[in-house]
């Protein structure tokens, strides 16, 4: 077994855990904060937008069972990559989408994946997700961990609203792509 780490930010971390955690080869998914200047940040500090941190998930995975490229594919399916100022209803820099890379190999894979998404025509606006060097990851408070199990009804409502929003955004992008290419 060869363990690797990935860190992705994509809005509220509550909606980022289950889609990764259910995959074979995933060893752990932790909700937390990264990218800021305060050590041991709390949820309230991150929410205040004064810490510089972004909500994110840290994923430990067995790269013999699931690849970093597969994780990138899952990540892109969970976010609106054209929105740099948060995701869906969660607005501000603390909810911005970011791919935090651990190595040059991850950076190259993330860049290739981003370019492929841009060329796909799925989205009608530029892909604006930055690729940044990973910094210290601070686990969030326990009540945030595996939220989908702790409050399944609320999680399902949030998850379904997010899926509907993303489906609509993708449809709008495909419709514009089709109209542009049939003229």
Swiss-Prot record:
Stated family: Belongs to the MsrA Met sulfoxide reductase family.
Name of encoding gene: msrA1
Keyword Iron-sulfur: no
GO molecular function: L-methionine:thioredoxin-disulfide S-oxidoreductase activity; peptide-methionine (S)-S-oxide reductase activity
Catalysis performed (reactions): L-methionyl-[protein] + [thioredoxin]-disulfide + H2O = L-methionyl-(S)-S-oxide-[protein] + [thioredoxin]-dithiol; [thioredoxin]-disulfide + L-methionine + H2O = L-methionine (S)-S-oxide + [thioredoxin]-dithiol
Active-site residues (renumbered): 12
Domain of life: Bacteria
Top EC class, one word: oxidoreductase
Protein name according to UniProt: Peptide methionine sulfoxide reductase MsrA 1
Matches recorded under InterPro entries: Met_Sox_Rdtase_MsrA_dom, Met_Sox_Rdtase_MsrA_sf
UniProt GO BP: protein modification process
Keyword set includes Aminoacyl-tRNA synthetase: no
Family matches, as SUPFAM superfamilies: Peptide methionine sulfoxide reductase
Role: Has an important function as a repair enzyme for proteins that have been inactivated by oxidation. Catalyzes the reversible oxidation-reduction of methionine sulfoxide in proteins to methionine.
């Amino acid at each position: 077994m060869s363990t690797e780490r990935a860190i992705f930010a994509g809005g509220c971390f509550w909606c980022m855990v289950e889609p990764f955690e259910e995959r074979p080869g995933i060893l752990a998914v932790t909700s937390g904060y990264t990218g800021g200047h305060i050590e041991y940040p709390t949820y309230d500090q991150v929410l205040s937008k004064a810490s510089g941190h972004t909500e994110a998930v840290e994923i430990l995975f067995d790269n013999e069972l699931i690849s970093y490229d597969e994780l990138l594919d899952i990540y892109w399916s969970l976010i609106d990559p054209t929105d740099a100022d948060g995701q869906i209803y969660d607005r501000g820099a603390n909810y911005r989408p970011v791919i935090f890379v651990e190595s040059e190999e991850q950076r190259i894979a993330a860049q290739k994946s981003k370019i492929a998404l841009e060329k796909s025509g799925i989205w009608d606006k530029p892909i604006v997700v930055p690729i940044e060097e990973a910094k210290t990851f601070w686990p969030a408070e326990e009540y945030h961990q595996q939220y989908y199990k702790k409050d399944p009804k609320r999680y399902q409502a949030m998850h379904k609203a997010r899926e509907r929003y993303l489906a609509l955004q993708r449809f709008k992008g495909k419709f514009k792509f089709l109209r542009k290419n049939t003229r």
